[in-house]
């Protein structure tokens, strides 16, 4: 089940105020929301606080809020706004993106050497993503990791779709350039 299809299941929370559905929604979205918040505030502890604040506010105001058409978009927009307000209140500007967490490869290596090579490739990918400029990295995370369309990412970040397109092109070119020497091609 994709994040978007999960989001559709949770829209009923607003109509019913069901605590069990709310808890499921928190469990489903919290990891990606924390990761996104961390890309704005710069560390995991503050990101956790931002996401918790968003969910607390949603629970407290559930009766007054019109159910959103797109729960995933609504949550990411709320986290973005809360994180930016958090930075303003604490007198800080956006500093850097947190470490990119690469999920464990689904490729099952057959020997220790393959495991080491896969780990090294993941480390190179992580380093390449970390080397992106902050805005470029944020867009890359939304589009490639969270599955947002270019248009959704543009709306969420208050940018034009063309800007998102340009930033994604830059991100992909920089990542491929950084990874070029480390990629193994096995065409026989």
What is each model feature region?
Residues 3-6, 93-118:
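Internal acidic/polar
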Residues 80-97:
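Arg/Lys-rich amphipathic alpha helix in sigma70-family domain 2
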Residues 26-44, 61, 129:
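Amphipathic, Lys/Arg- and hydrophobic-enriched alpha-helical face
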Residues 2-4, 12-13, 94-97, 155-156, ...:
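C-terminal edge and immediately downstream basic/flexible tail or linker adjoining helix-turn-helix-like DNA-binding
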Residues 1-32, 39, 188:
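N-terminal module of bacterial RNA polymerase sigma factors
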